[in-house]
């Protein structure tokens, strides 16, 4: 049992709590015997939902939490005053090593504040970024940052690139991942002040495989494995991605139902088409890890259904087994030392 990856799940956060978080947790433990889930929230409500399912009882626990942080609440006040909320209780589980990860679709602000103040940042990390996987032509890329730091500095973006590279190599399995910075052109002199200042720092960084600037239209083509940007740009890209994906799926389904011929054709291509459209479904990729913390915190969409919870829980396995926080701390410390040595002329 000690080898199991322990994941706490906020059963009270999000638009469809507790139904979808509980269902997703059950699907996760049924899908992979390496994971154990602790459902955090109101006991009677969670127990009622669990009665619907068959699952290995020894790998699902309930952790009591009587309070709920609502989306509209000021995050700092909510974290400070609602000590028995599902988010605070779950975060403390990570902080004290009682679980390996925490997954929540609750208030984004509360998750960001709780991650930094309760779980805590890794030594050397300036700003923890949110980093979701997004689909590309041949696989996935990591979009970093997509919502945590709207006023980032060049040093923050450099750290995002390094943390993103570690994640893609050790969790996703892409060796020597390519890092690109989002820009309005591919030329080195293009961009706003932030991009222009960040570019040379990324170019000279020996810990990443920097491929230069990438335009937004090249992101779906897989121009980079790690797509670096500040949070405002990243959030716009993410929301556009999700909107286009949902629209594409809807339009294809509509087109297949327009005539008898199209319906027959749809039946012939259904298996391949279903698999292709599945790649545009955001829930297939799980939530966005808040990288740079001492433990793993994953933020899922507020509208997450069971499938996204399941995939978010399962992505915690590789993160935990590969000891990502330790790798991040080591790489950042080495980078800092090399920068200081260069300044001293060593």
Language-model segments: which ranges?
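Glycine-rich phosphate/diphosphate-binding loop of Rossmann-like nucleotide-binding domains
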Residues: 19-20, 32, 36-38, 43-47, ...
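Short, glycine-rich nucleotide/cofactor-binding loops
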Residues: 8-19, 148-158, 299-306
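N-terminal glycine-rich anion-binding loop in soluble enzyme alpha/beta folds
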Residues: 20-71
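N-terminal charge/polar-biased segments
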Residues: 1-9, 15-19, 47-48, 53, ...
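Glycine-rich phosphate/nucleotide-binding loop
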Residues: 116-129, 133-143, 223-227, 231-341
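Phosphate/nucleotide-donor binding subsite
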Residues: 55-99
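Short glycine/serine/threonine-rich phosphate/pyrophosphate-binding segments
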Residues: 17-21, 84-97, 101-115, 121-122, ...
């Amino acid at each position: 049992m000690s080898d199991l990856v322990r994941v706490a799940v906020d059963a009270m956060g999000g638009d469809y709590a507790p139904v979808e978080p509980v269902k997703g947790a059950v699907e996760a433990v049924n899908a992979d015997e390496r994971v154990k889930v602790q459902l955090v929230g109101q006991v009677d409500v969670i127990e009622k939902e669990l009665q619907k399912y068959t699952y290995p009882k020894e790998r699902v626990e309930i952790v009591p939490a009587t309070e709920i942080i609502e989306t509209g609440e000021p995050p700092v006040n909510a974290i400070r005053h609602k000590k028995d909320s599902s988010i605070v209780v779950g975060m403390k589980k990570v902080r004290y090593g009682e679980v390996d990860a925490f997954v929540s679709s609750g208030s984004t602000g509360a998750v960001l504040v709780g991650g930094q103040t309760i779980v805590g940042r890794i030594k050397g990390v300036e700003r923890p970024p949110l980093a979701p996987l997004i689909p590309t032509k041949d696989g996935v890329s990591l979009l970093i940052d997509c919502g945590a730091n709207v006023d980032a500095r060049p040093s923050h973006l450099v750290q995002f690139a390094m943390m993103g590279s570690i994640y893609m190599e050790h969790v996703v399995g892409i060796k020597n991942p390519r890092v690109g910075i989002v820009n309005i052109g591919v030329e080195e002199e293009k961009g706003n002040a932030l991009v222009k200042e960040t570019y040379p720092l990324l170019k000279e960084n020996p810990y990443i495989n920097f491929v230069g600037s990438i335009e937004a239209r090249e992101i779906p083509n897989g121009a980079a494995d790690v797509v670096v940007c500040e949070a405002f740009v990243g959030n716009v890209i993410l929301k556009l991605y999700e909107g286009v994906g949902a629209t594409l799926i809807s339009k294809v389904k509509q087109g297949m139902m327009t005539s008898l011929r199209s319906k027959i054709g749809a039946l012939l291509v259904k298996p391949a088409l279903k698999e292709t459209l599945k790649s545009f479904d955001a829930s297939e990729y799980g939530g966005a890890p808040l990288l740079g913390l001492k433990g793993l915190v994953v933020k899922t969409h507020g509208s997450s259904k069971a499938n996204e919870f399941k995939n978010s829980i399962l992505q915690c396995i590789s993160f935990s087994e590969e000891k990502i926080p330790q790798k991040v701390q080591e790489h950042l410390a080495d980078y800092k030392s090399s920068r200081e040595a260069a300044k001293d002329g060593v």
